Amino acid sequence: MKLVILMRTDIKMGKGKMIAQAIHAAVGATSKRNWKYLKWRLTGEKVVVLKADIETINKKIKQCKKQGIRTYEVIDAGRTQVKPGTKTCVAIGPDDDEKVDKICSDLKLL
């Protein structure tokens, strides 16, 4: 089980901003306490952050929906480094490693 966060690298965000956005994504993705969440918690809470541009993120969201994999999109309020309404990242999962890897294995670590 793993949770993958696709972080936008095609917009300018500082490291602190990226960390905050990743936390928002992780909290949002794990807010529904279903059996996948419980399994993820019991198996080490693996989290991986990968680089992506907006086109790739939107493509991966569509692929997840087709495969029944939960996603959580972070839309920024625009108070600091990006414009209001900017999609900064998306969380995928938590779900089985194999299912998530099928969608995200072509992306590189942040």
Walk through the language-model features, giving the residues of each:
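Short basic, glycine-rich beta-strand/loop surfaces that mediate nucleic-acid
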Residues: 4-6, 43-55, 66-110
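Glycine- and Gly-Pro-enriched alpha-helical subdomains that act as flexible
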Residues: 2-33
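Short amphipathic alpha-helices within nucleic acid-binding modules
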Residues: 57-62
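Flexible, glycine/charged-enriched surface loops at secondary-structure junctions
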Residues: 35-40
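Low-complexity, intrinsically disordered basic tails/loops
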Residues: 26, 41-43
